[in-house]
A protein has these predicted regions:
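Glycine-rich phosphate/adenosyl-contacting loop at the front of the ribokinase-like
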Residues: 1-80, 90-91
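Conserved phosphate-binding/catalytic region of the ribokinase-like
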Residues: 1-9, 14, 28-34, 177-180, ...
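Alpha-helix C-terminal capping segments
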Residues: 67-76, 120-122, 288-291
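Hydrophobic beta-strand scaffold residues
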Residues: 77, 103, 185-186, 243
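A glycine-rich helix N-cap at a beta->alpha junction
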Residues: 95-112
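Conserved phosphate-binding/catalytic loop of the ribokinase/pfkB sugar-kinase fold
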Residues: 104, 108, 119-164
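Conserved beta-alpha-beta core of the PfkB/ribokinase-like small-molecule kinase fold
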Residues: 154-234, 250-252
Length: 330
């Protein structure tokens, strides 16, 4: 695996985030459930933006955030995701390339505009997302750079894209190429509502194609309709080689075969915004995994990266991640 050109290649939604600080009343007035992601059409997105107030514009997308984190750590990262040839598409492409990730998916010249996500951050640091998927949902097998996929130690798939039939086909095609070339396949479940919409097909994907599964407590219990986190642990155990399951302030649990590792969280400052926590956990974990670190160390790397990003507004760390690792993990 050391001869691969990329440590991790990710496939996901190419989105520009608009982060806005809001209160619970705003969520109630717009019938939004705190801490979840809701899909909206372009008209709904425009109305929400107009009423939300000024925001911070930054490139996002769950898998894109993870790959940006891996690149910031010094890993060799590539990303596949569709944008339109518009202003937001140019912003997305510039930002992910600027952190050192390879991004060469051609921009669409017609059709829906580049995806955007309004992220409402409440005073308790919870984020509630309203996402217009736009051009990103049009990703299909023709958009895949299969040479890049074949050259990845790990192919990382974003569960949010599972809402698109074309993207499902792209996922399966990419996973088959990755595995046939000796790579591993990792999946992030992304959102509990997304899991509930596609429970059976997600279970089949995990059982048949996934080596490393990332999920939070809500997502993993939704996947197996479990009554508790502990029950979900036993249901996922053995279905894939590795499961890395995050639990917010309770840290994370990493499973592999009969092994179970409990990873404490890192508290690096006041909690500001949890938007990129899961994405950066996956970045740290996969960075460690592609360097041959043991699973407990991988979990610690993920926990530290997540601990850093939640102390700031926005999903991509503004601090030096290599310096952070050197300071806390040696």
């Amino acid at each position: 695996m050391t001869t691969k050109s990329f440590d991790v290649v990710g496939i996901g939604n190419a989105i520009v985030d608009v982060l806005v600080q809001a209160d619970d009343a705003f969520l109630d007035n717009h019938n939004l459930t705190k801490g979840t992601m809701a899909l909206v059409d372009e008209g709904q997105a425009e109305r929400l933006y107009a009423s939300a107030g000024p925001g911070l514009e930054t490139s996002g997308g769950s898998a894109a955030n993870t790959l940006a984190g891996i690149a910031q750590l010094g890993g060799r990262a590539g990303f596949i995701g569709r944008v339109r040839d518009d202003q937001l598409g140019a912003i997305f492409a510039h930002d992910i390339r600027a952190v050192g990730a390879r991004y060469e998916t051609p921009a669409a010249s017609s059709g829906a505009s580049t995806a955007r996500c309004l992220i409402l951050v409440t005073p308790d640091a919870q984020r509630t997302m309203c996402t217009y998927l736009g051009a990103s949902v049009g990703l299909d097998p023709a958009d895949l750079d299969l040479e890049m996929v074949a050259q990845a130690q790990v192919l990382y798939l974003e569960g949010y894209l599972w809402d698109s039939d074309e993207a499902k086909q792209a996922f399966i095609a990419a996973a088959d190429v990755a595995r046939s070339h000796g790579g591993k396949v990792a999946l992030s479940l992304s959102d509990a509502f997304c899991v509930e919409r596609h429970r059976e097909s997600f279970q089949a994907l995990v059982d048949g194609h996934v080596d490393v599964l990332f999920a939070n407590e809500m997502e993993i219990t939704a996947l197996y309709k479990s009554n508790s986190f502990e029950e979900a642990l036993e249901q996922v155990r053995g279905r894939c080689a590795i499961a890395a399951l995050t639990r917010s302030e309770q840290g994370s649990t990493v499973l592999s075969g009969d092994q179970t590792f409990t990873i404490p969280p890192y508290s690096l400052g006041p909690l500001v915004d949890t938007t990129g926590a899961g994405d950066l956990y996956a970045a740290g974990f996969l960075f460690g995994l592609t360097r041959g670190e043991d699973l407990e160390r991988c979990g610690q790397l993920g926990s530290l990266c997540a601990g850093a990003v939640v102390t700031q507004l926005g999903p991509r760390p503004q601090c030096s991640l290599p310096d952070l690792l050197a300071q806390h993990l040696g």
